[in-house]
């Protein structure tokens, strides 16, 4: 016991290092939990609009929105192709495949969901001739809406 006491007095940085590593683990756990909850909130919002969670484009859209909502990417500093590339890297896919999958998910939702539901969750103006918002407009408007809630 005395030997341990002498060692602890001689090496107080060991105890401090242990406390710091415990704090870092707690912060990491808290951040992971926050990220999980944020992703769930985004997916719930998309599903309420009519997006299907089983569609790959919806999951990619969730990741793109997460990057913007969590602050990992800034809306005013990031162009849309950088977001596709970041998600493509995370999901082992090309940015063009990410873009196309998101486009298909948006088109499918706009085709199958009720207009009243879409207007409730996406109250922004879009080109009526096209019948849906562009990927860029949708992503930036929804991320702004989610961040403000």
Task: Cite the ranges covered by each PLM segment.
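C-terminal output/effector regions of signal-responsive regulators
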Residues: 26-121, 125-129
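Terminal-proximal interaction/regulatory segments of ATP-powered molecular machines
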Residues: 121, 134-136, 140-143
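Receiver (REC) domain switch/output surface
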Residues: 2-15, 20
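Short alpha-helix boundary/capping motifs
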Residues: 10, 115-116, 133-134
């Amino acid at each position: 016991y005395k030997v341990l006491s002498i060692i602890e007095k001689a090496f107080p940085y060991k105890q401090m290092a242990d406390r710091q590593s415990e704090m870092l683990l707690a912060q990491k756990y808290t951040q992971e939990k926050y990220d999980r909850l944020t992703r769930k909130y985004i997916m719930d919002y998309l599903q309420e609009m009519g997006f299907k969670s089983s569609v790959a484009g919806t999951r990619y859209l969730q990741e793109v929105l997460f990057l913007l909502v969590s602050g990992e990417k800034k809306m005013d500093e990031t162009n849309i192709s950088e977001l596709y590339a970041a998600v493509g890297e995370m999901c082992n896919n090309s940015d063009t495949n990410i873009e196309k999958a998101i486009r298909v998910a948006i088109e499918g939702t706009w085709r199958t969901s009720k207009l009243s539901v879409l207007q409730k969750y996406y109250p922004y103006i879009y080109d009526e001739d096209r019948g849906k918002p562009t990927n860029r407009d949708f992503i930036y408007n929804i991320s702004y809406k989610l961040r403000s809630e």
